[in-house]
Amino acid sequence: MAHAAQVGLQDATSPIMEELVIFHDHALMIIFLICFLVLYALFLTLTTKLTNTSISDAQEMETIWTILPAIILILIALPSLRILYLTDEINDPSFTIKSIGHQWYWTYEYTDYGGLIFNSYMLPPLFLEPGDLRLLDVDNRVVLPVEAPVRMMITSQDVLHSWTVPSLGLKTDAIPGRLNQTTFTATRPGVYYGQCSEICGANHSFMPIVLELIPLKIFEMGPVFTL
């Protein structure tokens, strides 16, 4: 989960998020290299007294600064396209959960368990217990198994929302009249937090998402819900 004054990404809890972290480091390395070379060239330009004002054509240099950026863009685009394909890939899910966005709470439907439906509201400060997180904890958590592919069906009943859990690398828009889907496989148990990431009105910041991921064997004994 996130920490105060955190600069980096949250700890990855799914294969997709691990790929995103690797791609982030890959792109950041290229950006740092470009910035270093540009600053070094500026430093040499400002400090040296050697100038040549008679050069009007330099085919070799023009070729280099045309081909080199193209190569850099390819080095960034190829892994990005691979991750984009992986995020859109829908594997055979073991469980399907439907999430419906409202102003300003979420409704969840466990379609594989007798159509269990419940709402998830943010806990007001007066109801927080020791250890609860302000503006992030909810009255009803979504309980899911780890090491099992889960499909989330996401939509909205009023305005645009976005169902987002950073640790899992998930961000899917909830659009009225449209049903979007995404899949994920959590790699370790724990409690993971997210929020609506689409400005949806006055209480947009009061739409947290809490996933409680438990071992598959425990989940198979019977879904444990915090209702």
UniProtKB/Swiss-Prot annotation:
Its domain of life reads Eukaryota
According to Swiss-Prot or TrEMBL, what is its membrane topology? Answer: Multi-pass membrane protein
Instruction: State which residue ranges cross the membrane.
Output: 15-45, 60-87
Q: Where does Mg(2+) bind?
A: 198
Keywords, comma-separated and alphabetical? Copper, Electron transport, Magnesium, Membrane, Metal-binding, Mitochondrion, Mitochondrion inner membrane, Respiratory chain, Translocase, Transmembrane, Transmembrane helix, Transport
Quick one: which residues bind Cu cation A2?
196, 198, 200, 204
* Role played: Component of the cytochrome c oxidase, the last enzyme in the mitochondrial electron transport chain which drives oxidative phosphorylation. The respiratory chain contains 3 multisubunit complexes succinate dehydrogenase (complex II, CII), ubiquinol-cytochrome c oxidoreductase (cytochrome b-c1 complex, complex III, CIII) and cytochrome c oxidase (complex IV, CIV), that cooperate to transfer electrons derived from NADH and succinate to molecular oxygen, creating an electrochemical gradient over the inner membrane that drives transmembrane transport and the ATP synthase.
- Subunit comment for this entry? Component of the cytochrome c oxidase (complex IV, CIV), a multisubunit enzyme composed of 14 subunits. The complex is composed of a catalytic core of 3 subunits MT-CO1, MT-CO2 and MT-CO3, encoded in the mitochondrial DNA, and 11 supernumerary subunits COX4I, COX5A, COX5B, COX6A, COX6B, COX6C, COX7A, COX7B, COX7C, COX8 and NDUFA4, which are encoded in the nuclear genome.
Record-linked NCBIfam families:
CoxB (TIGR02866)
* Family listed: Belongs to the cytochrome c oxidase subunit 2 family.
The protein in question is named: Cytochrome c oxidase subunit 2
